Amino acid sequence: MKNKTHKGTAKRVKVTGSGKLVREQANRRHLLEGKPSTRTRRLKGIVEVSPADTKRMKRLLGKA
């Protein structure tokens, strides 16, 4: 039986050209007026998935 891609993970994580996994940071969708602007600035941009989670994420994406 073929492995299937976990669609929830596929929507949240992208694979770069070099094979790294990147994701958006949480806590920047709503209720922002109660959060300090320093915090919302710090949460900007994309970050690499931690090495502890990379193996599991790749398996969910069907890359390993």
Curated annotation (Swiss-Prot):
Biological process (GO) annotations held by this record are: translation
Which residues lie in Basic residues bias regions? 1-14
User: What GO CC annotations are associated with the protein?
Assistant: cytosolic large ribosomal subunit
The alphabetical list of record keywords is: Ribonucleoprotein, Ribosomal protein
Disordered, as annotated region: 1-30
Signal sequence segment: none
In terms of superkingdom, the source organism counts as Bacteria
- What Gene3D superfamilies does this protein map onto? 4.10.410.60
- Quick check: keyword Ribosomal protein in the entry? yes
A Pfam family per the record:
Ribosomal_L35p
* One Gene Ontology molecular-function label: structural constituent of ribosome
Give the compositionally biased regions (Basic and acidic residues).
Answer: 21-30
The UniProt entry, under InterPro entries, shows: Ribosomal_bL35, Ribosomal_bL35-like, Ribosomal_bL35_sf
Similarity section? Belongs to the bacterial ribosomal protein bL35 family.
| Entries under PANTHER family matching the protein | 54S RIBOSOMAL PROTEIN BL35M (PTHR33343), LARGE RIBOSOMAL SUBUNIT PROTEIN BL35M (PTHR33343:SF1)
Kindly provide the name given to this protein in its UniProt entry. Answer: Large ribosomal subunit protein bL35
What species does this protein belong to?
Answer: Corynebacterium efficiens (strain DSM 44549 / YS-314 / AJ 12310 / JCM 11189 / NBRC 100395)
